[in-house]
């Protein structure tokens, strides 16, 4: 091994002072904005000195050049693997933290070698949860290999179902002939004449750093990867390791939920059951977020699950968005589903479906054992599947509100769209809806109807805890975005702000948010010092299939400058890039949150805010009332009652004891059902019942989580948080 080597680059104290902004005197415990430079790292390790020490090398990269490297040794005890892993993890994290603070940088990603991961199995988990670094694992060997990625030589990735998509063929080892270095006559008898070319640990670390950067795209976000047959390669096909320590998932739920998950996963693995999800987009919307999280969790459980999306079509997405708005009752009354649009929609889904039903596809014989179909973009698949595989269980999942009162009005746009969709949906084995009043038309047989809320992941970028260093990086990034678009900037941390995070959609009640804020400002006169009045932040990022966002965004800005010009300098309106941690930070640093949707599905963003300890003021629409306990974790108002919203805003902002009590209650009373683990348990239960046990469920409007907990022998315990099971009239 080479002698230990320390980082050589020296940070500039002048630049450090210039970039660091002053900490607010009113809130000295919160760091100010700091401009941090994005960086990447490569981390490698190897046992050295006759198994007595472990060498760790770290290479620093700025996306163009290798800028620095360090290597050091730590004691090695092969007989104490857990203690040894802890030593390596601590050393790596301390080294990266020290470099970050000294050089004013933020590590976004790190390449980790398989050899190192074997010695420290939870290193990736710690990098992700403790330092907000995306860890990407590479099988970098301690000797040189010859890449087969050449012209006319194709890498192939598996087209079979499964949560792991291999990344290519094994590369051959490069050997050299010792005769090239010395006289072969001087070699002893029986000595191997072809030897591998060794690769030092620092070379391995540098290789890992360079490979890691290739997985990041515009905006420094990990690239979305789609495999053959449009299988979504979640976490870069398994190369990104966010959570290797499954115990981290266990900590997010109660004992009953976790015991149920383990029992279900054991049965699915034993029976080798393959699960398939089919939805319209691989990123940008709530459904996509849930699918990424659930596939990641299933991979950790070693449950065989895969997720497929169709080829995107802008013309079809315009049709599906129109259908969505029509069903929710927020579209222009003159907007209708034309025959031309319906035919285009049908041909699009048929074309994609034929790829999946063809030999070797996920919906062909030998493919998935159960199919979960998401939302009104995909029901055209259902009759096609039934023709090819009539015995395959098909579960339809509806994530949106369907205005059952309008659906049954003869000749209405809602009736036309619903009849078109129901013609396909009726062939499914089960219809799953949000547990919300009047979300399901009466056409759906009650025996086929089951209830399940939406979910979010407490360990992904949207909801995990971010420390102050990472938080200030994302707040700085948001400031830069505002400057770039010439938008008002947040005064945080000197000034508080109130936030609504939602898509720019006609149903999100954004005009009501602005009006409520204006009323709140008037109430603040003589009650709150002018410098202490909070700002308003409206932000969100959109789905791939949402063409309305720009239209609504423009309308919001026009409204502010026309009707609320007095308060315009204190209102920040931003369409954010697709960075989960950015939205996480904006929520975590807000005083409290609003969610004034006029029509809504479940809107799990409410639970994300509560989980972060942020009281929420929201409207009684969709699934929002299920998540907020009025007067305890937030306030519920009628849609359009902006005066009541403003008064609650004033109470929360001026009564510190009330705020602290609500914040703590919100943080500690979020149900397992709205997290990935509880949600995954419901899907696993359906797979076990339909496939493993051959039971065709007749839920009659029951909650899937209730059926699952009863079947697993893990009934809800007294005091266990869960969504209210009051009188629901889901069908209208």
UniProtKB/Swiss-Prot annotation:
GO terms for biological process: glucose 6-phosphate metabolic process; glucose metabolic process; trehalose metabolic process. One of its GO terms (molecular function) is alpha,alpha-trehalose phosphorylase (configuration-retaining) activity. The keyword Glycosyltransferase applies. Optimum temperature is 32.5 degrees Celsius for trehalose phosphorolysis activity, 37.5 degrees Celsius for trehalose synthesis activity. Stable up to 35 degrees Celsius for trehalose phosphorolysis activity, 32.5 degrees Celsius for trehalose synthesis activity. Pfam families: Glycos_transf_1, TreT_GT1. Its EC number is 2.4.1.231. Optimum pH is 6.5 for trehalose phosphorolysis activity, 6.5-6.8 for trehalose synthesis activity. It comes from the Eukaryota. Keywords: Carbohydrate metabolism, Glucose metabolism, Glycosyltransferase, Transferase. It catalyses: alpha,alpha-trehalose + phosphate = alpha-D-glucose + alpha-D-glucose 1-phosphate. The keyword Ribonucleoprotein does not apply. Coiled coil: none annotated. Residues 1-25 form a propeptide. Activity abolished by 1 mM Cu(2+). 0.1 mM Cu(2+) reduces trehalose phosphorolysis to 76% and trehalose synthesis to 48% of maximum activity. 1 mM Zn(2+) abolishes trehalose synthesis, and reduces trehalose phosphorolysis to 40% of maximum activity. Unaffected by EDTA. InterPro entries: Glyco_trans_1, Trehalose_Metab_GTase, TreT_GT1. Homodimer. Reversibly catalyzes the synthesis and degradation of trehalose from glucose and alpha-D-glucose 1-phosphate. The equilibrium lies in the direction of trehalose synthesis. PANTHER family: SYNTHASE (CCG-9), PUTATIVE (AFU_ORTHOLOGUE AFUA_3G12100)-RELATED (PTHR47779:SF1). Belongs to the glycosyltransferase group 1 family. Glycosyltransferase 4 subfamily. This is Trehalose phosphorylase. It comes from Grifola frondosa (Maitake).
């Amino acid at each position: 091994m080479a002698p230990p080597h320390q980082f050589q680059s020296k940070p500039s104290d002048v630049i450090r002072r210039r970039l660091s902004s002053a900490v607010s005197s009113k809130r000295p415990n919160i760091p100010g904005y700091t401009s941090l430079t994005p960086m990447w790292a490569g981390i490698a390790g190897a046992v050295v000195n006759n198994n007595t020490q472990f060498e760790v090398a770290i290479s620093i990269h700025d996306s163009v050049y290798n800028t620095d490297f360090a290597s050091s040794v730590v004691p090695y005890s092969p007989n104490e693997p857990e203690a040894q892993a802890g030593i390596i993890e601590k050393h790596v994290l301390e080294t990266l933290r020290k470099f970050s603070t000294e050089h004013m940088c933020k590590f976004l990603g790190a390449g980790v070698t398989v050899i190192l991961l074997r010695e420290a199995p939870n290193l990736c988990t710690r990098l992700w949860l403790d330092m907000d670094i995306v860890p990407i694992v590479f099988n970098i060997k301690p000797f040189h290999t010859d890449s087969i990625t050449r012209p006319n030589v194709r890498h192939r990735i598996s087209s079979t179902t499964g949560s792991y998509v291999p990344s290519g063929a094994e590369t051959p080892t490069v050997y050299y002939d010792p005769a090239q270095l010395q006289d072969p006559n001087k070699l002893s008898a029986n000595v191997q004449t072809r030897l591998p070319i060794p690769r030092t640990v620092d070379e391995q670390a540098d290789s890992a750093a360079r490979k890691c950067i290739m997985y990041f795209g515009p905006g420094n976000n990990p690239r979305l990867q789609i495999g053959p047959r449009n299988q979504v390669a979640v976490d870069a096909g398994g190369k990104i390791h966010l959570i290797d320590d499954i115990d981290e998932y266990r900590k997010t739920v109660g004992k009953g939920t976790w015991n149920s998950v383990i029992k279900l996963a054991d049965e699915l693995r034993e029976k080798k059951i393959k699960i398939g999800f089919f939805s319209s987009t691989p990123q940008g919307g709530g459904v996509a977020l849930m699918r990424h999280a659930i596939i990641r969790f299933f991979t950790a459980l070693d449950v065989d699950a895969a997720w497929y999306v169709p080829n995107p079509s802008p013309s079809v997405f315009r049709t599906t968005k129109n259908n969505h708005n029509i069903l929710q009752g927020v579209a222009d009354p003159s907007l209708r589903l034309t025959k031309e649009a319906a035919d285009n929609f049908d041909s699009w889904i048929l074309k994609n479906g034929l790829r999946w039903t063809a030999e070797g596809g996920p919906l062909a014989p030998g493919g998935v054992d159960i199919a979960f179909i998401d939302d009104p973009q995909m029901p055209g698949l259902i009759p096609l599947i039934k023709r090819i595989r009539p015995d395959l269980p098909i579960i339809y999942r509806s994530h949106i509100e369907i205005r059952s009162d309008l659906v049954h009005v003869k000749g209405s746009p809602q009736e036309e769209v619903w009849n078109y969709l129901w013609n396909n949906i009726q062939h499914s084995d089960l219809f799953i809806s949000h547990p919300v009043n009047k979300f399901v038309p009466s056409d759906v047989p009650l025996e086929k109807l089951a209830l399940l809320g939406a979910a979010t992941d407490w360990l992904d970028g949207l909801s995990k805890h971010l420390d102050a260093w990472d938080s200030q990086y994302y707040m700085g990034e948001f400031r830069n975005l505002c400057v770039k678009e010439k938008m008002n900037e947040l005064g945080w941390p000197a000034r508080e702000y109130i936030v609504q995070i939602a898509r720019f959609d006609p149903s999100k009640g954004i005009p009501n948010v602005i009006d409520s804020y204006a009323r709140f400002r008037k109430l603040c006169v003589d009650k709150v010092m002018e410098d202490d009045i909070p700002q308003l932040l409206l932000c969100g990022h959109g789905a791939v299939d949402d063409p309305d966002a720009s239209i609504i965004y423009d309308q919001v800005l026009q409204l502010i400058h026309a009707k609320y010009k007095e308060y315009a300098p204190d209102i920040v309106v931003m369409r954010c890039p697709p960075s989960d941690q950015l939205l996480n930070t904006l929520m975590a640093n807000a005083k409290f949150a609003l969610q004034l949707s006029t029509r809504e599905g479940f809107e799990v963003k409410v639970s994300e805010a509560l989980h972060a300890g942020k009281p929420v003021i929201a409207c009684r629409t969709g699934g929002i009332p299920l998540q907020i306990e009025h007067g305890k974790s937030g306030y519920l108002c009628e849609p359009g009652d902006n005066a009541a919203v403003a008064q609650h805003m004033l109470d929360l902002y001026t009564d510190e004891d009330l705020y602290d009590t609500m914040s703590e209650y919100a943080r500690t009373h979020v149900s397992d059902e709205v997290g990935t683990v509880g949600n995954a348990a419901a899907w696993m239960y359906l797979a076990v019942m339909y496939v493993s046990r051959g039971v065709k469920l007749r839920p009659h409007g029951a909650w899937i989580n209730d059926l699952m907990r009863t079947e697993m022998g893990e009934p809800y315990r007294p005091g266990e948080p869960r969504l209210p099971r009051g009188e629901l009239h889901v069908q209208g």
